[in-house]
Amino acid sequence: MITVHISGGEKMLKEAKKVSKKTKIIGVSVLTSLENNDLKKFYNIDNSKKLVSKMTKVALKSKIDGIVCSPKEIKIVKKISKKKLKIITPGIRLKNNNISKDDQKRIMQPKEAIKLGANYLVIGRPILNAKDPMKIINLINEEKI
C-alpha cells in the first residue's frame, strides 16, 4: 500500500494508480489531528464529514483502492463508496489511554471502528507507549478494549 493525499486531485490520483500496477493506492482524506475550525482555514469547509464526503467521491472517480479516514467518517465513506474502497482508520485510541496531550482529535476505540466497517486500523502510540505492548496487542485482538 502507498498513500497519497486526495487533496492532490483526481489527475494525480489517476496517475498514481496508472503507474502502480501491483501496489494498492490509498487516498488520505482529512487528517485525524484536524478539527472543524482547522478545516475552515485550510479548505474553507467547517465540517469534516462534508469534506470527507467530497474526497470519497474524488477517490471513487480516480479508481484508487482505498481511503484513510477518521473513524468518525467511516459511515459516510461506506455509504458513498458502497464498499468499493478499503477503509484504513487512524485515530484509534484505547479506552483507558491518557489522551489529554494527544494531537488526535477525531478518535474511536478499536472495537467500535471495526463494527462501523474499518478494514484496517492504524494503532501507533497506544501500543508503542504501552508498558507492555504485546499485552495491548493481544487485548485488541481479543476485542477486550
Regions found by a protein language model. Give the residues of each.
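Conserved anion-binding
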Residues: 1-75, 79-88, 93-99
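C-terminal helical cap(s) of enzyme catalytic domains, especially alpha/beta-barrels
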Residues: 13-19, 114-116, 126-145
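Glycine-rich phosphate-binding loop at the start of an alpha helix
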Residues: 53, 107-108
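Structural motif
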Residues: 62, 116-117
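Short hydrophobic alpha-helical runs that function as membrane-insertion/retention elements
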Residues: 68, 121-123
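Glycine-rich beta-strand-to-loop/alpha-helix junction loops that act as flexible
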Residues: 89-90, 123-126
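Short glycine/threonine-rich catalytic loop with a Thr-x-Gly-x-Asp
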Residues: 100-106
